[in-house]
Every structure is written in C-alpha cells, then in structure tokens.
Curated annotation (Swiss-Prot):
It is an enzyme of class 2 (transferase). Its EC number is 2.1.1.67. S-adenosyl-L-methionine binds at residues 29-40, 69, 90, 134-135, 152. Its main location: cytoplasm. This is Thiopurine S-methyltransferase. It comes from Gorilla gorilla gorilla (Western lowland gorilla). One of its GO terms (cellular component) is cytoplasm. The lineage of its organism: Eukaryota, Metazoa, Chordata, Craniata, Vertebrata.
Length: 245
C-alpha cells in the first residue's frame, strides 16, 4: 500500500442515474472469461482485504465465508487456509476451473439438484464449494447462513436495475453478528458506462441501511494506466464494513 493515497472525504458524483439502464447479460460475462477479458481479476489478491483480514477474523476459525460472483479470486484460498469454509457463486465454469487449477487444488463436480443443468465444484479438502449458476438462483440451493461476505467486484458488476434484488439476496444469506465486507468504485459515471458500475454511498444506504450499520473503513486511489481507456482520469476504491444493527 506504499504510495497509495487514502482519503475519507472524497466528493461523490451527483449524476448517479446515468448508468441505471446499463445491462450486461450472463452470456456476455461468460464471453469475457472465454476471451480472456478478465482484467478485474487480481492475481495477488486484494490488498485492502490483506491489510484488514486478521482484524476481521479476530483469531476465529470455522467461519462460513461467502464470495458472490467469485471468479477465481485467490482470497478464497486465504480463508480456506485459515480453517474457514468458503462458498462462492460464479456464472463462468471456466473461471471456477481456473481457480482450482491455478491454486493446485483437486476437486469434484456434482449436479445442483435444485437448479437443473448447473453444477457445484467442491475441493477435495471439503472447505471450498463453488456453485456455477446465477447469483439469483442460489437461494434455491438452501446453502444456509454465512458469518462473512467478501463482496469485491460483485455489487459493482450487477446491473444497476438488479441491485435491490441482489442486496436482498445477500441479506438473506447473512447469519447473526455478520461482517459484510464490500468494495465499491468511485469515478465519474458520465465518462464510463460500466461495468464496473459506480456505486455511491447513498446507494449503499438505500440497499442495506435498514438492516445494517454501514461504515466506510478506507478509500484509496485505485487509478491505473489501463483505466485511461475508460475515459476517466480518477478512480477510487472504497472498503465498507456492514454489520448487524
């Protein structure tokens, strides 16, 4: 994190409606994996999570941790290696297979009986289960409640018109005394159509505020050279902690 600016008083952009009708289909997301357009994947894992992880875990083991739209996030192995049970959901079977291959983990495949035509991939160790299906179909599997959710690249990828349904799905999966770790991006939405989409603080309050205490832990400068192609010159990432009211 050296050289990374941190600020908690960044102004939000006022034109929050400009992206509201943007839509990416599940097929388009699958095509991104097939065509290798996965610049959103972080090979070294998320640095803000790495920074705060031990503080969040507080020495606990055996937690159930959920990864929405997990892709091949290396952070799943971080939690599994610390003795936690990881469940993820990802529409791309290729992304799931790449996770197990790149992490050198053996796995098995089973059909998801509640969702015909879909599969769940389970590590041989038994503590990583990745469901290959739509996030909105997942509640039908009765996967239970979770102690923690790590939402990086999920809420910001959901079509803006589907956010309320997504948030309700996430809230339905949370157990008592949960910790919901949420990363969102702040940039001028008039210059880039998304995804990832711009999610202002007011939207987080609208989606989760009735159930959750919402605290912004950190805002960091996340602008990279590749973001110039988005037509923007400024990009910040914000890490939120949502807890039970």
């Amino acid at each position: 994190m050296d050289g990374t600016r941190t600020s908690l008083d960044i102004e939000e952009y006022s034109d929050t409606e400009v992206q509201k009708n943007q839509v990416l289909t599940l097929e388009e997301w699958q095509d991104k994996w097939v065509n290798g357009k996965t610049a959103f994947h972080q090979e070294q894992g998320h640095q803000l999570l790495k920074k705060h992880l031990d503080t969040f875990l507080k020495g606990k083991s055996g937690l159930r941790v959920f990864f929405p739209l997990c892709g091949k996030a290396v952070e799943m192995k971080w939690f599994a290696d610390r003795g936690h049970s990881v469940v993820g959901v990802e529409i791309s079977e290729l992304g799931i297979q790449e996770f197990f291959t790149e992490q050198n983990l053996s796995y098995s495949e089973e059909p998801i009986t509640e969702i015909p035509g879909t599969k769940v991939f389970k590590s041989s160790s038994g503590n990583i289960s990745l469901y290959c299906c739509s996030i909105f179909d997942l509640p039908r599997t009765n996967i239970g409640k979770f102690d923690m959710i790590w939402d990086r690249g999920a809420l910001v990828a959901i079509n803006p018109g589907d956010r309320k349904c997504y948030a309700d799905t996430m809230l339905s999966l949370l157990g008592k005394k949960f910790q919901y770790l949420l990363c969102v991006l702040s940039y001028d939405p008039t210059k880039h159509p998304g995804p990832p989409f711009y999610v202002p603080h007011a939207e987080i309050e609208r989606l989760f505020g009735k159930i959750c205490n919402i605290r912004c832990l950190e805002k960091v400068d996340a602008f990279e050279e590749r973001h110039k192609s988005w037509g923007i010159d400024c990009l910040f990432e914000k890490l939120y902690l949502l807890t039970e009211k």
